[in-house]
Structures are given as C-alpha cells and as structure tokens.
C-alpha cells in the first residue's frame, strides 16, 4: 500500500502521485500526532552515530619439524572486537537508591548484597528522579558501545601419514571476555546505568579444548582378508561454557523481567558442563577389478556412552547467595535451580556402504 504514494502529504495530488492521509489510515490503525504515549509503551531506537562492528586480529606461531614426518607447533591468536551492539534502556536514571537484603524463601539464606532499585519507595514518590519518562515502560536504544577480546594459545603435535599411520594431537587454552554477548538474550545488563559491571567472561568462553585423532591402516596389505582396513579414532574434550545466574523476576524495578541476576552475582559466573567423547571409524575397502571398489564403513559416536549434559537451569531466585561460581548438578531435577535441562546424544552407531567406479 505504501509503495503507491506518499504518507501524510499536505495537499494530496491525484493519480499515481496521490498521498496516503490520516483519513485513509483511520479504518485500519489509530493515527495521532499529539498527546502522550500510552502507559506501558516500549520504544526502540538506534544510536544516531551507530557504527558497524570492527575487529583487529593478530597471530604468531612457530613450527619445528622432527625427523621426516613429525612436527610440533605453538600458536597464539588475538582478536579484539569493538562497536558491538548493545541495547541500553535510556529511560532509566542513576537517581535510583541502593538497597540491600532480599529474604530467602523456604529456608534459603538471605542475599544481603546491595543493588540499585528503581522500584524503591522514593522512585514511586518521585518518578522523575528515577525515570526519564515515567509514563512509558522502556526506551531501548541500540548502541555500538560493547567490545570483546579473545586470547588463544594452541599447541599441536602432528605426524604426516607414512608407514600406514598419521596422528594429530591438539590442545587449546583460551579466554574470551566481553560486555554483551547478545542483546536479544538474558545477557542484557542487570544495571543499565552501570554497564562497566557487565564486563565478564563471554558466553563463548571455553578455557580448555583437547583433540586427539589418528588414522591407522592395516599393515597386512598382501592378505586378501586383512588388507584394506582403516581405523580412525578421535578423542575430544571441551571444558564448559559460562552461564548467567538469573533471579527469574524483576527484582530491581527497572521494567526488565528476564535479565535480573541475584544481587552481587557477576555476569556469567556459572560454569556449564564439560564435554568428552570417544568416536571411531572403521572401514574395509574391497577392490572389484581395476576400476571399481566397494567400501564398508562403521562409525561410532560417544562410544563410551558418556552422559554429556548440555544446558543448566540457571533461574536460581533473587535470594541466591554467594558463592556464585557454581556448576550444574544431576542431583536435582531439571525444574530445580542448577539442574541439568538437556543432554547431547548418547552412543550412536551407523553403518555405510559405498561403491566407487
């Protein structure tokens, strides 16, 4: 409809240049250019000088060959990203008072740590002290003010394929820190007027990663039965990702209901479950004359059938008290705080047949 003319012109011309006026829109939407915004309005806008994200990267490495087929290497990777998006509620003012003491429920201890509270009585008596426009709910402005930094060190041992055998052993130690991982998630700021307090481990931080992979061919190449076999094991381990502890309610009265943390809890202070798996691939190649071959494969994933938990119930309540560097546990149900809520697949085996010609 809007592509057929202009919206809200002065004296509307006729024909293809006709305008869409308020009277045209009235049967479909309410049009008003005057008056205050309805209570509970949520506004979204963009920073006037919004900038696109930028990244600076650097890396350095050294590699040493040992013998004819072995090598070792060490590498360092640095990535600094700036002007990342962050949704900031500009309706909140720093005049809200500091309060402390959230009583525990069902015998839980009280969290007595201080936090800034826009729901305090002083804000109810004098809303303009705490809110730029007390009549609206939120005024979210997308700003390019967040940044992130990544440091990674990689050690690697490698053997090129020779004598029917190859090997790769890799260890990565890394750390990722940022202000905001995703402005559409529960990682929004707990205190919108103290954004520096949000700087912590990134959602993608993973401190340790180990991979061991090998390929072994059958040494009996002249045997019709034992030749053509190939065995490829992979062992992998990843340490857990951080997760945010959430109160599950708007405890600080800022009209944001999904991002509040227990008072005093740093962002991403929980540590998620680690991952470990042993996978294998076994294949047998049979030549069918000079131009064709048949290959049977059997692949197994998570052969040890280890339970690799994926996510944690991070809603722990407003009265959750230190220590905050907690982990998930299988001792409680998924509906309880810190209970595991999902797991990755158990042991899987798949068979395949491939004909090449």
Please give the residue ranges for each predicted region:
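Extracytoplasmic gating/loop element in the C-terminal half of outer-membrane beta-barrel translocons
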Residues: 23-35, 202-203, 221-291, 295, ...
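Outer-membrane beta-barrel channels and translocator barrels
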Residues: 55, 67, 162, 174, ...
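Solvent-exposed loop/turn elements at secondary-structure boundaries
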Residues: 1-143, 252, 257, 266-269, ...
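C-terminal beta-signal and terminal closure region of outer-membrane beta-barrel proteins
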Residues: 103-106, 308-357
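Hydrophobic, lipid-facing positions within transmembrane beta-strands of outer-membrane proteins
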Residues: 46, 56-60, 151-155, 208-214, ...
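Residue-level signature of outer-membrane beta-barrel architecture
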Residues: 64, 159, 216-218, 284-286, ...
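Membrane-spanning beta-strand positions in outer-membrane beta-barrel proteins
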Residues: 59, 65, 71-75, 166, ...
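Gram-negative outer-membrane beta-barrel transporters
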Residues: 73-224, 234-238
